[in-house]
């Protein structure tokens, strides 16, 4: 398993409970596939550099995870499907 740093941006229109549910769903993607969440930093609502899907702000979440390729692929798939996530990225640590 390798370490990855990731970030995703959640729609700012969600209430706190729904935002926490999205974060829990993403963590579950990794833990259900044998991965470990090493760190999660919720940056909160911040201005976007440019408008995304008519939003000028987003709720940023940055994380560090140790996971296999199947969890990485599932993370990408889930983030593309979930309408509450407007952007995501995952980068392999050296």
Q: Which role fits each region the language model picked out?
A:
Residues 2-94:
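Structured, basic alpha/beta domains of bacterial-type, RNA-associated proteins
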């Amino acid at each position: 398993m390798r370490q990855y740093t990731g970030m995703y941006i959640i729609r700012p229109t969600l209430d706190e409970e729904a935002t926490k549910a999205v974060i829990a769903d993403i963590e579950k993607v990794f833990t259900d596939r044998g991965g470990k969440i090493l760190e999660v930093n919720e940056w909160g609502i911040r201005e976007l550099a440019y408008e995304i899907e008519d939003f000028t702000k987003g709720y940023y979440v940055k994380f560090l995870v140790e996971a296999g390729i199947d969890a990485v692929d599932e993370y990408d798939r889930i983030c593309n499907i979930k309408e509450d996530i407007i952007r995501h990225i995952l980068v392999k640590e050296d």
